[in-house]
Amino acid sequence: ALAEKAASLMAAILGWTEQQFRELGKGKESADLALHLVTVLQGASLLTHTFNQPDLLLRETARLREWVNAL
C-alpha cells in the first residue's frame, strides 16, 4: 500500500513536470526531460541527506537551472 502511494505521488510529480516542459514547447521529448529533471533532483536529495551536505543540492539545482535555461 505504501509503495503504491509513493508511486502515485511520483507519477503525479512526473506528470506535472512533463506538462511544464510541454508548455515550454518541448513536445515529444517532454516526458524524457521530466524524468531526467526529477531523477537528478531525487538523487541529489538522497545524497544531500545521506552525507548531510546541503551544498550538494545547491550545486545540482544550479546545474539544473542552467540546463533548463539552455533548452
Features from the language model and the residues they span:
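Short coil/turn segments at secondary-structure junctions
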Residues: 1-4, 21, 25, 48
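Amphipathic C-terminal alpha-helical segment
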Residues: 1, 38-56, 69-71
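Extended, well-ordered alpha-helical scaffold segments
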Residues: 6-13, 56-64
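Hydrophobic alpha-helical bundle segments that form small-molecule/ligand-binding pockets
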Residues: 10-34, 68-71
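Alpha-helical scaffold segments in carbohydrate-active enzymes
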Residues: 16, 40-43, 63-66
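Amphipathic alpha-helical interaction segments
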Residues: 32-39, 59, 63
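Residue-level recognition of alpha-helical structural elements
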Residues: 2, 26-33, 53-57
